[in-house]
């Protein structure tokens, strides 16, 4: 994502999760990048800008991370993450 997209996502996270205004944007952006990297490891090539499901998972993941429950997110959202990983049709490798 580019900086402008991080700024938009930061504001969405502030509004959705009632993040206090005194929380620096850098803290939220650091959490976004950490969670974005982890989700990209689980499903490479994910587009968090245009895919609403991916964006929603990222925002929820950031919330869990900001309250220091990073691994708890993975446990609670495990079935959703697996469904998300399998939601994209894979091209036949034999072609």
Report residues per predicted region:
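Conserved short "hinge" loops at termini or chain/domain junctions
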Residues: 1-54, 72, 86-95
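Intrinsically disordered, low-complexity N-terminal regions enriched in serine/proline/glycine
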Residues: 21, 60-63, 76
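Short acidic/histidine-centered micro-motifs embedded in hydrophobic/aromatic stretches
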Residues: 31-34, 61, 80
């Amino acid at each position: 994502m580019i900086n402008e997209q991080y700024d938009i996502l930061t504001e969405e996270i502030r509004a959705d999760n009632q993040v206090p205004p005194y929380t620096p944007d850098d803290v939220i952006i650091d959490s976004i990048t950490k969670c974005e990297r982890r989700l990209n490891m689980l499903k490479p090539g994910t587009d968090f800008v245009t895919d609403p499901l991916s964006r929603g998972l990222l925002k929820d993941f950031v919330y869990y991370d900001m309250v220091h429950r990073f691994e708890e997110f993975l446990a609670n959202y495990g079935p959703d993450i697996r469904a998300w990983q399998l939601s994209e049709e894979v091209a036949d490798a034999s072609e």
